[in-house]
């Protein structure tokens, strides 16, 4: 199997602490770059676990369309700013951060007090602007999850009236692009490919770690296929019907037909079900009249046999 190398050719950290990594993977057989690129992109964009703000409580506020006295931003703006926070929580359970601030003050993400298990990636992210003589109290809920989780309106009705739910985006990877370079040529002129992949994260994880986690998920997905053992199912023998157990004597056949069948080792209806009309005619001293008699007797108990034997 062709061995390829992975090289990170660029790594950048933006002002908002988001990270961009560019990777070159190759050489690959033709078609493998597309397979790798599509598989990694799908897991990177929707399969990685991340952290997100899921709810906010604002003192004195019980709905998202309100305004806060002495605060420049309305509630919707504050919720949006909280939703856009890049956060990394190592706690699988709910984490709650708190903020109590007095104006004049521009509240930033770093002003929110969390436990040591929560890291705010972009501490300079603005949250709200408080005017002099006014206060702002926030409670911010952070959870871990995968993908996108919209607000559940049914559960929202059972939560505290002042806890404002937020559509949660747990995806730590913001964008993935890849291109395929088909110019690489191996010895002997065989065509090769290289995969160039750009991964942009929100800063809560690095592009290197994101690709490693995506690859591990794909390995776990495909690993069972490598050890699949195909077990041939042996079909169960169908249970004979009650009619098949009827002895030959109970068909009330003529003495001639009965004796001919007995000499042919036919002792029950089950034995007769293996015969066709043509097979009956081949029994010694068994004519068409006797064959018709057998057919009629079988039909009386709901059993029919084919007119001719099945060709193999």
Swiss-Prot record:
Keywords: DNA-directed RNA polymerase, Nucleotidyltransferase, Transcription, Transferase. Residues 240-312 are annotated as: Alpha C-terminal domain (alpha-CTD). The keyword Nucleotidyltransferase applies. One of its GO terms (biological process) is DNA-templated transcription. It catalyses: RNA(n) + a ribonucleoside 5'-triphosphate = RNA(n+1) + diphosphate. GO terms for cellular component: cytoplasm; DNA-directed RNA polymerase complex. The keyword Transit peptide does not apply. Transmembrane segments: none annotated. One of its GO terms (molecular function) is DNA-directed RNA polymerase activity. It comes from the Bacteria. Gene3D superfamilies: 5' to 3' exonuclease, C-terminal subdomain, DNA-directed RNA polymerase, insert domain, RNA polymerase, RBP11-like subunit. Residues 1-229 are annotated as: Alpha N-terminal domain (alpha-NTD). SMART domains: RPOLD. InterPro entries: DNA-dir_RNA_pol_insert (IPR011262), DNA-dir_RNA_pol_RpoA/D/Rpb3 (IPR011263), DNA-dir_RpoA (IPR011773), RBP11-like (IPR036603), RNAP_asu_C (IPR011260), RNApol_insert_sf (IPR036643). Its EC number is 2.7.7.6. It is an enzyme of class 2 (transferase). Belongs to the RNA polymerase alpha chain family. DNA-dependent RNA polymerase catalyzes the transcription of DNA into RNA using the four ribonucleoside triphosphates as substrates. The N-terminal domain is essential for RNAP assembly and basal transcription, whereas the C-terminal domain is involved in interaction with transcriptional regulators and with upstream promoter elements. In cyanobacteria the RNAP catalytic core is composed of 2 alpha, 1 beta, 1 beta', 1 gamma and 1 omega subunit. When a sigma factor is associated with the core the holoenzyme is formed, which can initiate transcription. This is DNA-directed RNA polymerase subunit alpha. It comes from Prochlorococcus marinus (strain MIT 9301). The lineage of its organism: Bacteria, Bacillati, Cyanobacteriota, Cyanophyceae, Synechococcales. The gene is rpoA.
